Regions:
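Short, charged early-sequence alpha-helical segments and their helix-coil boundaries
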Residues: 49-85, 103
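Charged, low-complexity interaction regions
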Residues: 23-35, 52-55, 73-76, 95-99
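Short, flexible helical or helix-coil boundary motifs
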Residues: 20, 24, 48, 65-72, ...
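Short terminal alpha-helical segments
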Residues: 1-44, 107-120
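Amphipathic alpha-helical binding modules
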Residues: 73-120
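Generic structural concept
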Residues: 14, 38, 42-45, 62-66, ...
């Protein structure tokens, strides 16, 4: 995996996260779970700027979103689902170890000890 490929994933991921965040912000049903997903999207968007392995953050992000969607019965329309599929493709580049290193349901995995985690 070359630097140019990593940079391409970073750019695509940031654009996709931005678009998904905007669509979720427009939804009328702003539940606590949906607000948590938006918080995590914003946090990963920020982390991608400096991360050496953006695909790992995207993998964690998509696993968190899928887990929250199942747990809280969140339905994503086609446009939002298509954006998550793009993120899923980038996240697959993290390899198998990326899936076993995090609790998918825990929002705190996206925040360092010095960062304040929003609670809803």
């Amino acid at each position: 995996m070359g630097t140019s490929q990593t940079e391409a994933w970073r750019v695509t991921a940031r654009q996709t996260i931005h678009a998904l965040y905007q669509l979720l912000a427009q939804r009328p049903d702003q539940t606590a779970a949906l607000l948590d997903i938006r918080d995590v999207l914003l946090q990963v968007y920020r982390k991608l700027e400096t991360s050496k392995r953006p695909e790992i953050w995207v993998n964690r992000l998509i696993n968190y979103i899928r887990n929250a969607a199942i747990k809280d019965h969140i339905y994503f329309p086609k446009e939002q689902e298509a954006l998550m599929l793009v993120l899923g493709e980038i996240g697959q580049k993290a390899g198998f170890n990326g899936q076993y290193r995090a609790d998918f349901s825990d929002k705190s995995q996206f925040y360092s000890l010095t960062e304040t985690m929003p609670r809803h």
